C-alpha cells in the first residue's frame, strides 16, 4: 500500500462520506458535510487527506472557530472527524496528516487548537501530537422515557417511567418559555450577556455563529427553547 497526502478540497466530500461509512459504520447526509466544512462563518474547514490511487484512506480536519478570551477574540480551530481506513491504520497516516494539518492551520493564522477525542484517538493526540489533557466534558442527560432503555429490567420499566415524571424538573416560576428560533433582538441580548462575563474562554457566540451552528442542515434535529424572566 502506498499513499500520499494533499489538502482537502470541496470536491472530496463524497469520498469523505465513503470513508466515514467505512470507519464509523454508518452514513450521514451529504448536506451535513456541506454545512460543516463549507459554510462555517469562521472559515472553511482546514484539512489534509491521505490518498491511495483514487481512494481517500485518511483524513484530519481542523474547523476554524473564533474564541473569546475575556474581551479579546482570537482565531482557533477544533479538531473534528479524524478518520483512518482500517486497512491503513498503524502506518503513520494519523500522525502525518495531523502534523501537516496543524502546519496548514498555523499558516492560516490559527493560534489555538482544541478537540474532544474519542478513546481510540485520545492516545495519539497526547502521545504523538503533544496535546495536553485540560479536562473532561461533563454530560447532562435526563431520560424522558426510561422504559425505552434496554439496560432497565423489563419488570421495572413502567415504574421507571412513573419516577421520571415525578422527579424535579427545575424551577420555571416566573419564566416565560418560547420554542423556536429567537429574533435578532433576543440574540443580541444573549450575546451582550455572554460578552459581559470576564475571565472565561469560550467560543465567540455571535448571532451569525449560532444561526450556523444550529442550522437544520446540520441534521442534528436541534430545537431552540428560550427562557425569559422579567421581560
Predicted regions, residues:
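Conserved GNAT acetyl-CoA-binding A-motif
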Residues: 105-118, 128
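A short helix-loop-beta-strand connector motif used in the catalytic cores of GNAT acetyltransferases and
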Residues: 37-49, 53, 58, 126, ...
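Conserved catalytic-core motifs of GNAT/GCN5-like acyltransferases
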Residues: 67, 116, 131-152
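Conserved acetyl-CoA-binding loop-helix of GNAT-fold acetyltransferases
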Residues: 84, 89-103
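Non-catalytic substrate-recognition and accessory regions of acyl/acetyltransferase enzymes
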Residues: 199-223
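Short amphipathic alpha-helix that is part of the acyltransferase structural core
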Residues: 1-37, 41-52, 56, 62, ...
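Short glycine-/small-residue motifs
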Residues: 59, 231
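A conserved beta-turn-beta hairpin within the catalytic core of GNAT-like acetyltransferases
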Residues: 67-79, 89
Amino acid at each position: 500500500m502506498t499513499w500520499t497526502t494533499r489538502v482537502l478540497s470541496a470536491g472530496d466530500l463524497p469520498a469523505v462520506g465513503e470513508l466515514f461509512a467505512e470507519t464509523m459504520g454508518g452514513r450521514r447526509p451529504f448536506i451535513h458535510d456541506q454545512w460543516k466544512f463549507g459554510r462555517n462563518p469562521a472559515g472553511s474547514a482546514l484539512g489534509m487527506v491521505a490518498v491511495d490511487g483514487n481512494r481517500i484512506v485518511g483524513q484530519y480536519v481542523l474547523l476554524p472557530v473564533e474564541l473569546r478570551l475575556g474581551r479579546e477574540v482570537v482565531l482557533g480551530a477544533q479538531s473534528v472527524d479524524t478518520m483512518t481506513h482500517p486497512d491503513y491504520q498503524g502506518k503513520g497516516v494519523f500522525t502525518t496528516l495531523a502534523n501537516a494539518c496543524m502546519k496548514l492551520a498555523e499558516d492560516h493564522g490559527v493560534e489555538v487548537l482544541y478537540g474532544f477525542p474519542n478513546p481510540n484517538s485520545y492516545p495519539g493526540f497526547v502521545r504523538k501530537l503533544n496535546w495536553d489533557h485540560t479536562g473532561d466534558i461533563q454530560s447532562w442527560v435526563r431520560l424522558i422515557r426510561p422504559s425505552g432503555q434496554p439496560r432497565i429490567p423489563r419488570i421495572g420499566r413502567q415504574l421507571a417511567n412513573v419516577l421520571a415524571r415525578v422527579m424535579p424538573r427545575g424551577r420555571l416560576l416566573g419564566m416565560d418559555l418560547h420554542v423556536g428560533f429567537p429574533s435578532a433582538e433576543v440574540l443580541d441580548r444573549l450575546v451582550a450577556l455572554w460578552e459581559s462575563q470576564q475571565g472565561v474562554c469560550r467560543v465567540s457566540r455571535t448571532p451569525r455563529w449560532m444561526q450556523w451552528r444550529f442550522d437544520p442542515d446540520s441534521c442534528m434535529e436541534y430545537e431552540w427553547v428560550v427562557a425569559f424572566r422579567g421581560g
